[in-house]
């Protein structure tokens, strides 16, 4: 039996409650489908600070590095607002991304048909929407040097950020996008600002060359990032996979997420480079939503984003494509049945809590797996 090592970091706020629903699915898959998941659990964020004085301990960091994949809940809350900057809860996530060398951020924008009316756009524009935004996560203007505020000595100051990309950084993120497109609808749209930015010129050139050399079977389109934002709102279903840099990816993924009308239900993944020996990538999966400390412990949190993040984990880290498809279909079926947590409640639907939503999805998953 294949052993699949999964490290769970529930974190703070609603993270532990949402993670509990994933544990139910893992237990079922191990018991009934010989999935071979071996799980360990650690602390991250505020809970880690309370226990260790750090946003993640060295021991848990070592476990994350040794695992096949990390499933992450959420971090932060008002309790830790006054802790030193370097050990703030969010520093745990940043440390994981850095030490695992996660350079590719995958943000799906999926509009479940049952929730199409929740979007701010017309339902016909977003119903069935399924976009994947691939964002470069470790380069660009967020990390380029120099990065400083300079006192000019005349009562004026100058803020400096530096947008920097090397060829290899663009090649590897483009490769991820093209490979993912091959598993979807075989289309990639690369977005940059080559009309005003030299980094955009290089981005365009390298993506084009990478496509020609290795991925000519995939349909490639180039679009200026500002035009891409407009097209996401105008006609979002024209896109399949979008690949872009750190800054534009940060913005465009949030725009795309809001098209679905359910930002709090969306998953994400961050991937590293393939291991030279095994070909496996380090990976971290997490819901887009925050820790929601105001509802933590009340049993009303929506676990769908956490469960959908586990579905991404099944697909991208363990190549359990059928199981991932079934789990995503189970979520859609439960929503079609009118089952809702409070955050997505609508007239004529049945309101449930965290555990009942998780149980409903698990029951549907079991029926699809039979």
Swiss-Prot record:
Catalytic activity: (2R,3S)-3-isopropylmalate + NAD(+) = 4-methyl-2-oxopentanoate + CO2 + NADH
EC number: 1.1.1.85
PROSITE patterns: IDH_IMDH
GO biological process, alphabetically ordered: L-leucine biosynthetic process
Record-linked SUPFAM superfamilies: Isocitrate/Isopropylmalate dehydrogenase-like
Pathway annotation from the record: Amino-acid biosynthesis; L-leucine biosynthesis; L-leucine from 3-methyl-2-oxobutanoate: step 3/4
Cellular localization per UniProt: Cytoplasm
Cofactor: how and how many bound: Binds 1 Mg(2+) or Mn(2+) ion per subunit.
Gene Ontology MF annotations: 3-isopropylmalate dehydrogenase activity; magnesium ion binding; NAD binding
Family matches, as Pfam families: Iso_dh
Principal location: cytoplasm
Cofactor: Mg(2+); Mn(2+)
Keyword set, alphabetical order: Amino-acid biosynthesis, Branched-chain amino acid biosynthesis, Cytoplasm, Leucine biosynthesis, Magnesium, Manganese, Metal-binding, NAD, Oxidoreductase
Annotated InterPro entries: IsoCit/isopropylmalate_DH_CS, IsoPropMal-DH-like_dom, Isopropylmalate_DH
HAMAP family: LeuB_type1
Subunit structure comment from the entry: Homodimer.
Family assignment from sequence similarity: Belongs to the isocitrate and isopropylmalate dehydrogenases family. LeuB type 1 subfamily.
Main function: Catalyzes the oxidation of 3-carboxy-2-hydroxy-4-methylpentanoate (3-isopropylmalate) to 3-carboxy-4-methyl-2-oxopentanoate. The product decarboxylates to 4-methyl-2 oxopentanoate.
UniProt-recorded name of the protein: 3-isopropylmalate dehydrogenase
Source organism (scientific name): Rhizobium meliloti (strain 1021)
